[in-house]
Amino acid sequence: GRDSCVNKSRCAKYGYYSQCEVCCKKAGHKGGTCDFFKCKCKV
C-alpha cells in the first residue's frame, strides 16, 4: 500500500526526498511524497 516505505525512507523537513522516492519506485509505486516526516508512496 501507500505505506510500503514509511519506515525505510527518511524524510527531511526541507528539500527533495530522494530516498522516499527511490524506495517507492523500487516497491512498484509511481513515486513518493513526505507527509509529517513519513514516506508515503503514490499509487
From Swiss-Prot:
It is found in: Secreted. One of its GO terms (cellular component) is extracellular region. The keyword Protein transport does not apply. This is Potassium channel toxin gamma-KTx 3.1. GO terms for molecular function: potassium channel inhibitor activity; toxin activity. Belongs to the ergtoxin family. Gamma-KTx 3 subfamily. The keyword Secreted applies. Expressed by the venom gland. Keywords: Disulfide bond, Ion channel impairing toxin, Knottin, Neurotoxin, Potassium channel impairing toxin, Secreted, Toxin, Voltage-gated potassium channel impairing toxin. Blocks Kv11/ERG potassium channels (tested in MMQ lactotroph cells that contain the three ERG channels: rKv11.1/KCNH2/ERG1, rKv11.2/KCNH6/ERG2 and rKv11.3/KCNH7/ERG3). This toxin can be used to distinguish slow deactivating components (ERGS) from fast deactivating components (ERGF) currents, since it specifically blocks ERGS. It comes from Centruroides noxius (Mexican scorpion). Transmembrane segments: none annotated. The presence of a 'disulfide through disulfide knot' structurally defines this protein as a knottin. Has the CSalpha/beta fold, which comprises one or two short alpha helices connected to anti-parallel beta-sheets stabilized by three or four disulfide bonds. Disulfide bonds join 5-23, 11-34, 20-39, 24-41.
